[in-house]
Amino acid sequence: IVGNPNLVKGGYFHTLVLEPDKLEQYKIIEAASRNSKIYKDLSGGEMCLLQKEADELQVLRDKLMANNVCKDLIQDIDVEYEVPGLIQLEDEWWKLKADIKNNTEKLVIDLKTTSNIDKFAYSAKEYNYDSQAYIYSSYFNMDMIFIVVDKISGKIGIFDCSSSFLERGKEKVEKAVDQYRLFYKNNDFDPAQYLVTKTL
């Protein structure tokens, strides 16, 4: 089976919240698991959603939109969804796509799901949401916030970005550019000779 179930679930959740008219692009199978014969027969090797997963994500979507603060941020008077962009940072080009651009509140909003909202600050560092926030806020010239829904508890959080969070994102972007240039733009570089050295 090709694909990652978490990516499919994340995409489905975004579509549920932002573009429910496009849900038909997702194939949903009524099966106990992806190891079952019926799933394998119907999926054709694709990564599909299980019906129970789609039902769980619908519950999360309903909880999110039942919260007045979140609903207003997502469905404000002047909002745009899935807004693409291209920005030059450190003399390299970066592609982006914002989930929500709220022009009323002057905010860029990213939807996230998590398995533990109490550890989201750690996840944000681990999954480089700091560099995402730096790139997006630089491009749109707006503050960025994350609306986060806990997949287990249904708890909702709104996380804004401190200056130190954005600065760390900027440093990661600079480091990524250095690595990119070393691996892809330096003809003398031999990847087999690359190693990391650190003192413990």
Model-identified regions with their sequence ranges:
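Metal-dependent nuclease catalytic cores that hydrolyze phosphodiester bonds in DNA/RNA
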Residues: 1-96, 194-200
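Short histidine-centered catalytic/ligand-binding loop motif
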Residues: 2, 42-49, 118-127, 162-165
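Short, solvent-exposed loop/turn segments at secondary-structure junctions
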Residues: 18, 86, 114-116, 151-153
